[in-house]
């Protein structure tokens, strides 16, 4: 499987600069929040989201050099993403992310919530200073979508009436919205034609949905040391994802186990078995592959270039995480 190092080669130097700048942008006026943010930016993330912004920027600028605003947009994107992870971990009461202790487990929930708020506030400040109203609207929508996604997930816990449409809507809010809107924003900053910007949005949306579906499959199939959290943790917390939704169609018993919140001994083990036996994993793979194919199609509007090639290969990378 291709590594992110070779995948992001066209923006390698840009990403190095971004990592250095992120720590500086967060600032040290609040030592505890600064320490929390420092911990986050050192937590081994692959910087996929800012890399997409940088690749789209270079693919739409072609021979022109990246502007300071394109670089700042990539930094804002990573700040927003990181803030959402911090709040996610508080809501999910998670102790590990990428096999690294979460901010809430390292400090406490109060500091974690404030650290997330701080990053959202910082990103909003830098966003406003881009002086581009359309980009401000696109990224502000992402912050709203994060909250809406968390609310949707919370109110639908252990709800077996959840359908595929609701699942995809929640996945868009929590994952795809940031990738879609930031990709479009990069096109806007490059003064790309309107239809190109719209295709960039669609690329990001379908790539983001594929990414989330793959994540949800891995939650069932990957051991803790690979995933950085216990296998089946989504199901345990009542978050019903694509593999469980598909398996419930074949095995209604799975729905009953979920509704009683795995209260009896052996319930969870049986539920995980039913997901595997009920074609939940196979059908979810097909769903992810379909979203990936849609993402590929929307890149045809870009001229051939190394950054465009990386954006195409990124689609294969997302699906390749399953192997």
Swiss-Prot record:
Role according to the record: Possible role in synthesis of the nonaprenyl side chain of plastoquinone or in synthesis of other prenyl chains such as undekaprenyl pyrophosphate.
This enzyme's EC code(s): 2.5.1.-
Name this polypeptide is given: Prenyl transferase
Keywords on record: Isoprene biosynthesis, Magnesium, Metal-binding, Photosynthesis, Transferase
Binding site for Mg(2+) 1: 88, 92
Residue sites binding an all-trans-polyprenyl diphosphate per the record: 97, 174-175, 212
Residue sites binding isopentenyl diphosphate per the record: 46, 49, 81, 98
Origin superkingdom: Bacteria
Transferase recorded as keyword: yes
Cofactor(s) this protein cannot do without: Mg(2+)
GO function terms (MF aspect): metal ion binding; prenyltransferase activity
Keyword Transferase: yes
Entry's cofactor comment: Binds 2 Mg(2+) ions per subunit.
Source species: Synechocystis sp. (strain ATCC 27184 / PCC 6803 / Kazusa)
GO biological process, one term: photosynthesis
Binding site residues for Mg(2+) 2: 88, 92
Family per record: Belongs to the FPP/GGPP synthase family.
Matches recorded under InterPro entries: Isoprenoid_synthase_dom_sf (IPR008949), Polyprenyl_synt (IPR000092), Polyprenyl_synt_CS (IPR033749)
